[in-house]
Amino acid sequence: MTQAHVLRDRAVYEERSTTRSRTIWTRPVDPALDVELVHEWMHEPEVVKYWDMAWPVERIAAYLADHDADPYRANYLTFVDDTPVGYLEVYDPAHDVLAAHYPVEPGDVGAHVLIGDKDFRGRYSVSLGLATNRFLFQRPGAVRIVGEPDVRNHNLLSLLVFLGFHKAGELDLPEKRAALMLCDRADFERLSSGPRRRRQLQASEG
């Protein structure tokens, strides 16, 4: 695996996993330092199926640099302790091609997410998903998370429902047939709280 730059001092969010007793945290992508890692993840077979970005490293570098310069986008790496495990793209749907396919509302936050380290798929998916939602909802004005995963990605769709999303329809986007998945802040907070729900979450990763 590509040697990662940890850069813990750049963390913009962190939490202690109650089910794993490990720290999940997030920092912005550094296009120059992180390109090799993102390039490696984009060539993972499970990622290629849905992201279709198995590009040369130079093209990945240009892609990350473009996002870094875009005021309506931000890319992040997610870590478990000092291990990089995931990649997150956050965007403003009002300034994305998605705006032509669904009624954007104030407070919508778009997100693309992948778990790049295959050792953390499955057993850490719920903890990482919860942390990602909490990170997104801490953004100023964030009211609803918007996702548009490939309709074939049944594992991700099931996980999103478990995390408080609901399917609002299907969209024909330029690169895929997508499920429009929405998660309202109030629904997420209600779903992720309470002793019964905590037991369900713990059991899901037991």
Could you describe each region identified by the protein language model?
Residues 151-169:
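Conserved active-site alpha-helix within GNAT-family acetyltransferase domains
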Residues 138-149:
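Conserved GNAT acetyl-CoA-binding A-motif
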Residues 54-75:
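Active-site rim helix/loop that mediates acceptor-substrate recognition in acyltransferases
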Residues 92-94, 148, 166-180:
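Conserved catalytic-core motifs of GNAT/GCN5-like acyltransferases
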Residues 69-108, 114-120:
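Acetyl-CoA-dependent GNAT
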Residues 122-138, 158, 162:
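Conserved acetyl-CoA-binding loop-helix of GNAT-fold acetyltransferases
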Residues 40-54:
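Helix-loop element at the rim of GNAT/NAT acetyltransferase active sites that forms part
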Residues 1-32, 189-206:
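Conserved N-terminal entry element of GNAT/NAT acetyltransferase domains
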